[in-house]
Each structure stands twice: as structure tokens, then as C-alpha cells.
Regions:
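Interfacial loop at the N-terminal end of multi-pass membrane proteins
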Residues: 1-28, 50-54
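Membrane-interface loop-to-helix entry segments
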Residues: 21-36, 79-91
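Alpha-helical transmembrane segments in multipass membrane proteins, preferentially the mid-helix core
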Residues: 39-43, 74, 93-105
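Helix-adjacent hinge/juxtasegments
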Residues: 42-76
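Hydrophobic alpha-helical segments of small multi-pass membrane proteins
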Residues: 61-71, 84-99, 125-133
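Membrane-interface helix caps and helix-loop-helix hairpins in membrane proteins
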Residues: 71-83, 103
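Interfacial loop-to-transmembrane junctions
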Residues: 100-130
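Juxtamembrane boundary at the C-terminal end of a transmembrane helix
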Residues: 137-147
């Protein structure tokens, strides 16, 4: 969702903490993160498709993607900080769930069959986890400051 001038004006009037990053940083950060997400999801869905991973492993990844794309609509489309806060908490929760599930299944498969471990995906997603953790704290703070 592209920010029009009304949305930009609305967002710029919100109270933000002093440690809030400048607006220009979000584009480059999300570009890198979406590349990581694409590789991660592509790998996971391919492994599910080829039956190297169980179908259920895709659930937290699908939910994470839905919540991730919903955030922009809640925050900038509806201009609703509370819904955006709930959504980003769900993004963080499903991300942790997805990576933990992948780790558990990968470890079990590796130990029982000798299949290669997929823990590289967890390591590749550390920037995503860190950014979403930071963004969650930022969004909750913005919501609190503007209640």
C-alpha cells in the first residue's frame, strides 16, 4: 500500500518515541527482509510440496504472511494503531512459532533419517526476528502514546 499525502500527514502527526527510526529506513529494511522471507517461504513450501516436511509446518508461515501483509492495511489504510498493535504481536508470535516448528521438525528428521538440517533458515531469519521485535515495541509505544 502506497502512502498518499493524507496518510503521510496522519502518520507524521502521531506521537513517536525519541528512538523511533527515520521514515526512510523502513523501505530498505523491508526490502532485505522480504528477500529473506521469499527464500525462507520458498524453501519451506518446496519441502512441504516434495513431502520432505509435513503440511502442518506451513501453517505458521502462511499465517505470518497474512498478518504481515495485513499490518500496512491496519496501520495506514484504517489508521488504526490498536489493530496494528494486535497484528504485529501476531506477526511476532507466528514468526517464532514458524521458526520453532521448523527447528523441531528439522532436528527430528535429521536425527532419525540423517536428512540435512534446515537450521540455516532459522539463522537467516535472525534479522527478521530482531526487526519485528523492535517494530513490535515501537508500534506498542506509538499506540500507547496516541491513545
Amino acid at each position: 500500500m502506497e502512502m498518499d499525502s493524507n496518510t503521510y500527514n496522519w502518520y507524521s502527526t502521531l506521537l513517536k518515541p525519541s528512538w523511533s527510526p527515520p521514515a526512510w529506513i523502513f523501505g530498505p529494511v523491508w526490502t532485505v527482509l522480504y528477500a529473506i522471507i521469499a527464500v525462507t517461504y520458498g524453501t519451506v513450501f518446496y519441502k512441504v510440496y516434495t513431502k520432505e516436511l509435513p503440511l502442518i509446518i506451513a501453517l505458521p508461515f502462511v499465517l505470518n504472511l497474512i498478518f504481515n501483509f495485513s499490518f500496512t492495511y491496519f496501520q495506514f489504510g484504517l489508521k488504526n494503531n490498536l489493530l496494528a498493535s494486535i497484528d504485529i504481536l501476531l506477526i511476532l508470535a507466528t514468526l517464532i512459532w514458524a521458526l520453532y516448528s521448523l527447528y523441531a521438525v528439522s532436528l527430528t528428521n535429521h536425527l532419525s533419517t540423517g536428512a540435512p538440517s534446515l537450521t540455516w533458515i532459522i539463522y537467516a531469519n535472525i534479522p527478521y526476528v530482531l526487526w519485528v521485535s523492535f517494530a513490535t515495541i515501537l508500534q506498542l509505544t506509538i499506540t500507547f502514546l496516541n491513545k
